[in-house]
Amino acid sequence: MPTLYTDIEIPQLKISLKQPLGLFINNEFCPSSDGKTIETVNPATGEPITSFQAANEKDVDKAVKAARAAFDNVWSKTSSEQRGIYLSNLLKLIEEEQDTLAALETLDAGKPFHSNAKQDLAQIIELTRYYAGAVDKFNMGETIPLTFNKFAYTLKVPFGVVAQIVPWNYPLAMACRKMQGALAAGNTVIIKPAENTSLSLLYFATLIKKAGFPPGVVNVIPGYGSVVGKALGTHMDIDKISFTGSTKVGGSVLEASGQSNLKDITLECGGKSPALVFEDADLDKAIEWVANGIFFNSGQICTANSRVYVQSSIYDKFVEKFKETAKKEWDVAGKFDPFDEKCIVGPVISSTQYDRIKSYIERGKKEEKLDMFQTSEFPIGGAKGYFIPPTIFTDVPETSKLLRDEIFGPVVVVSKFTNYDDALKLANDTCYGLASAVFTKDVKKAHMFARDIKAGTVWINQTNQEEAKVPFGGFKMSGIGRESGDTGVDNYLQIKSVHVDLSLDK
């Protein structure tokens, strides 16, 4: 018999747990149909943690049938008030288990427990509380007067069966943002975690069952993207798919939808987000925000301000202080245990990602001969895992691959601009449009930037501060659609128009 559970000990926090390893279908953990497994590795040590069941096409079909039966027979007939009760039950369980869930994120994704993983759980709790309280208060249609004898009304109805594919940089936070919006709207869900980071979502599935959600409403099927992701994208009985990940894979998901049943689609893809620092900004605060916006989560954030443009009159001063802040507050050396409060910058997710980021650093240093600053020598002495020191490249030209490509690590490029028009041109010169930030005390200038920048999110005098009530999504090649807030529910609803004729035959 395949192993469906294992015991995990986290001695640093005195946490012991029974970790599910199976596919979660119809509220039960089960083996994959072919018995294949995936080994998951602790990125802080490079050592294996455990192995979990890997779904295949047959398992996807099994999950779809479970989700379809649950939608047709139970969930579509469940009132919004009752859905809110289930989400409220889930909220209580998340609050009770938040340290365990955060610890699994630290173990499996390398997130520093105290400064990062616990913050993720706080955001998940906020999101769950929002949807639990709002689920029966959304506008689900409107009446439209037409003539004396005719009117129409609209109904917002769920799609039905929704597939969701979540990334490895925010495994549980992204899953909850997608899952809870879809559930609040009345859909059933099949969710695929990233193969690097499946443990927290599998454990979360136990809370789904405890919260009272009927069997088949939420199904968790870990596996490889090339197998499970492809099967979800092409399945003819899935009504909608939501994906977060790279732009390249997002394009494949879009193509799969077009080649199958034209399922509705939401994509949240890559970014190369700019942060603009004007000469009238509070320089110290701007530097603190910009450092946090690229080095937090080891730069593995789709909205990371990986391009920083500074007005030429304060450029040298900014660069000097930015390097000082990076060294003082974000240094990695000797802080290799993400469960230790001293660890602020964790490892990147895998050896593959480590090598990829390293190649960009080497290119910038040797091939492009850019000015470079790192908080520690690299490779870092004593590090067993995939640790990369915060890296700052300065005076970077627009032609540089480091400025054009999404590196997805603690690597930032800094360049200068002369005036507003110059800054805006530089900021918009990218195929991406996920997020942006501007630092200035000039209210008019700040709102002009918000108007003119081609990005789905704009932060003024801060960066990377997402809120549960606020829609999130990208422009251009950064995505299609929005999640979070009321819009995050509308995203999982479709509109039906009803025409009513009141005229009487004579």
From Swiss-Prot:
GO annotation (BP), single: beta-alanine biosynthetic process
Any GO molecular function: aldehyde dehydrogenase (NAD+) activity
Site (Transition state stabilizer): N169
One Gene Ontology term, aspect cellular component: cytoplasm
Keywords: Cytoplasm, NAD, Oxidoreductase, Pantothenate biosynthesis
The keyword Iron is annotated on this UniProt entry: no
Keyword Cytoplasm: yes
Protein name, per record: Aldehyde dehydrogenase [NAD(P)+] 2
Organism: Saccharomyces cerevisiae (strain ATCC 204508 / S288c) (Baker's yeast)
Gene: ALD3
